[in-house]
């Protein structure tokens, strides 16, 4: 009988210990969520920095924004994915980082634009995983040239042909 009562107290003690662990994990989670959202916002801001620098044809700012994008994107950890999704996302991240690094060292604005076309296509594929909450993003396309880019507004500012076709484009998707 004593062993039975002792076992009950042990089980109650274990349940209480688990409840305390859960409470402590719940207290940490909001801070981690906040940090993750801040990193997502920074990644999108860095991407938009590349795009906007290309719109004004500033090769140096484009290179700096690409370096920041690469560094911050490299810190991002994908969450809640199946093994197959994780493999695809990890492969995409590697490719996107390599493209951003190439933009940062590209010798000309035209080369940066060519690389940005590839980066934008790959980035849109995983945009759901890096998009901050409550931030609408738009995939835009220049129908004459077939190039796409991501923007945080519906207004068209074509980063690939700003001199001749600044407003050439349309929103083709929204997330």
Regions found by a protein language model. Give the residues of each.
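Bacterial Sec-dependent N-terminal signal peptides
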Residues: 1-25
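Mature extracytoplasmic or organellar-lumen-exposed domains after removal of signal/transit peptides
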Residues: 25-175
